[in-house]
Amino acid sequence: GFTHYVHGFEGELTLWVQQSFRNEILSDVLSFHYLFVYLFLIWFSPIYYILCRDEVMADKAVLNYSIIYLLAVPLYLFFNVEVTSSFIPGMDAIMYHESWNLFFFTEVDPLDNGIPSLHVGLPLGLLIINRLHIRSLGIKMAEWRHREFDLFVAANIPIYLFSIQYLGIHWISDVI
């Protein structure tokens, strides 16, 4: 794979993040957020727009997912990069502990799909689509009927950015 190139470029900054903020409660909260809030966000986004009877935004949300996955799959297949916790010595796979609520997810992960991070790409794509949509309508975000949902998506992106470093999952270059 290409993990040694990424590690050579980034060094052990993600290890520093993990060691600097290590906390059991934070680990549990971020593990839950990384898996379940993310799943809620990606499943709920198109459904939210459908329930609001905004078919245009529902279509755009699904198109966002399709494009992001079309871009990501070749990287997963041909540019294998291990997750940070399986490559950096001393880095713990915090999320991959034995817990009843994480067992299914942690047992099926091959730990070799470190680039790109869909946890950042999908919600960031939604934000971009939202901004482009309100621009095309000629309105401000404060006037848009989905502004609260947009704020929810925007608030989760920094949490994902920190979580993927802290939990020992992704490299910094995954999100650039």
Task: Spell out what each predicted region is.
Residues 50, 54, 80-88, 169:
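Transmembrane helix-loop junctions in multipass membrane proteins, especially transporters and channels
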